[in-house]
Amino acid sequence: MSGRGKQGGKARAKAKSRSSRAGLQFPVGRVHRLLRKGNYSERVGAGAPVYLAAVLEYLTAEILELAGNAARDNKKTRIIPRHLQLAIRNDEELNKLLGRVTIAQGGVLPNIQAVLLPKKTESHHKAKGK
């Protein structure tokens, strides 16, 4: 009965991406390919791209969360580079991680030196003499 093809065999399971198996949005397969092609080492373990994709996804989510808050504070619904800059520079750990990074169209943090501010004078509501 040759030539009849597969009849009683198991149906092949629907393909499931490594990203969905790991519960991630970032592409594990693409990260794995980039690790292999990037000449970082001769061999790349199966867990390394999953871990790296998870770290990248976490950092991205953290930055976007803070940038979204900055956009909302400025009464905007769209995140622009300025909001990313404000989010990163106002967060101590992200600022340290991305300290040498320049964000195009990001601007600078508003900062006025204390010595340039007008001096505070005593209030005019002093009790007058007898």
Swiss-Prot record:
What are the GO cellular component annotations? extracellular exosome; nucleosome; nucleus
Decide whether keyword DNA-binding is in the record: yes
Q: Does the keyword DNA-binding apply?
A: yes
Q: Where is this cross-link: Glycyl lysine isopeptide (Lys-Gly) (interchain with G-Cter in ubiquitin)?
A: K14, K16, K120
Residue(s) carrying N6-(2-hydroxyisobutyryl)lysine? K6, K10, K37, K75, K76, K96, K119
Give the GO molecular function terms. Answer: DNA binding; protein heterodimerization activity; structural constituent of chromatin
Tree of life domain: Eukaryota
PTM N6-succinyllysine: list the residues.
K10, K96
Question: Where in the cell is the protein located?
Answer: Nucleus; Chromosome
List of residues that carry N-acetylserine: S2
Q: How is it modified after translation?
A: Deiminated on Arg-4 in granulocytes upon calcium entry.
Q: Where are the N5-methylglutamine modifications?
A: Q105
PTM annotation (N6-(beta-hydroxybutyryl)lysine): residues = K10, K14, K37, K96, K119
Looking up InterPro entries in the UniProt record yields: Histone-fold, Histone_H2A, Histone_H2A/H2B/H3, Histone_H2A_C, Histone_H2A_CS
- Residues that bear Phosphoserine: S2
Compositional bias (Basic residues) spans?
A: 7-19
- Show the SMART domains listed in the entry: H2A
Where N6-glutaryllysine occurs, the residues are: K96, K119, K120, K126
| Location of region: Disordered | 1-22
**Listed SUPFAM superfamilies:** Histone-fold
GO biological processes: heterochromatin formation; nucleosome disassembly; UV-damage excision repair
- What do we know about how this protein assembles, alone or with others? The nucleosome is a histone octamer containing two molecules each of H2A, H2B, H3 and H4 assembled in one H3-H4 heterotetramer and two H2A-H2B heterodimers. The octamer wraps approximately 147 bp of DNA.
Q: Tell me the function of this protein.
A: Core component of nucleosome. Nucleosomes wrap and compact DNA into chromatin, limiting DNA accessibility to the cellular machineries which require DNA as a template. Histones thereby play a central role in transcription regulation, DNA repair, DNA replication and chromosomal stability. DNA accessibility is regulated via a complex set of post-translational modifications of histones, also called histone code, and nucleosome remodeling.
What family is it from?
Belongs to the histone H2A family.
Protein name stated in the entry: Histone H2A type 3
